[in-house]
Amino acid sequence: MNALIDADVHITWQDSNVFLSYLPDAWKGRFTQGYGHSETGFALSQPFFNPLEAGRPEGESDPDALLQWMEKTGTTACVLHNWRAPAVGNFGDTIYPGHLAEAYNRWLCDHWLSRSPSFLGSIVVAPGDPDAAAREIARAVRACPQVVQVSLTPGTLEPYGKPRFRPIFRAAAEHGLAVCLHAGAEGVGVCNPPTSHGWPRNILEYRVTPATNFIAHLTSLITEGVFTDFPDLRLLGLEVGGILPLITYLWRFDKNFKALRSEAPWLTELPSAIVRKHIRLGTHSTAIGDPEVYFKLLESFGADDMLLW
């Protein structure tokens, strides 16, 4: 029997004081006052993009409830995320978010991963200090073997292919972890607006743009040679706008690479081949019209095995 793994299960805490206990005393005041608080500090994250009514914490904060659901549905394992946590990468400073990331990772290990071997962890790091982020990856893996992934915010000031981010990808590759870009923190904090033309006025506009941010990072990671440097590295895109936008994107990427490959002489494969080898995308169960047409589109560029649930 094949394993059924849910790659994107959202978790949180019901009481922020539980998380607060993992922060050094010097930073607790900043957390409780809301300057960087994961629930209220980013004013944009709740009233504009994520209304409280969209998801109550009760269902996301009970490990026993998740285990019961897994048994009922036949789910073998779950990769656990806190959708707010990657926003530690959206601060203007680099010290406080590093402490937030470590606090979250310790909380994840103690309150969830220790409860069941079926729980797998997606830790977070603060990419503003890549060397510190790499050290946190090593610490978290040593502390908790059920860590399988590093989550990064797709909302940044620079694309992730830039050399300054190499320590993060090196650490992930050395420890056998996937790297995940999970949509949801674009335009939060000090990062760029969530669209290339600035700020949208409503959630409708925002919800149709995550693919553009993911594609920008993906183009940078491929062109700058990250997957050449780390041939075993895997990148996941979760809630980033689906796989179908990649079809026309990869056609154009391959086309331009053939004409401009002298700018990236370290690449020995077409971008589409690199994507098929290194990239996986999450999807949700949803009505897709005619499944036969859908799967023909996936097969058209060899993506029929790129989807995660």
Predicted regions and their residues:
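Helix-coil boundary/capping segments in enzymes
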Residues: 1-309
